[in-house]
Amino acid sequence: MQNEQELKELVREKYSQIAQQEKTANQSSCCGAGNCSTEVYNIMSEDYTELGGYNPDADLGLGCGLPTQFAKIRKGDTVIDLGSGAGNDCFIARHETGETGKVIGIDFTTAMIEKARANAEKLGFNNVEFRQGDIEHMPVGGNVADVMVSNCVLNLV
């Protein structure tokens, strides 16, 4: 049986592999970098394509819903996304907060943070940032966020 740290490292390794492979490879692999299955990662994935702020490069198909849908995000809010991955939900939240708001994505995988930062840079967003860290010990101060969202991550903690 794996201890907590070994399990955490396994999850980190798998998500790193996902971040580093081509998006088309992600769609046919359920367990990392490689074609081990013809299934998609998540059969419950919602259709983001019509949402404001959607960016296909940030959508790795890893979520299981639309966490911003019921979050009541307002213009000017500061939003934290726990387990932000390549930034998909952050960019949608950024659309809702507008230019006066701020979105902070937190992920514990270096490769996901790098991918998310590259996506934000391509989009020219200056009010979306990505921080590496564990959500159990978030790399943010207290009383920072108006809204917190997470998409299929808390089950991994």
Question: What residue spans do the PLM features occupy?
Answer:
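Conserved SAM-binding motif I beta-strand of class I
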Residues: 102-107
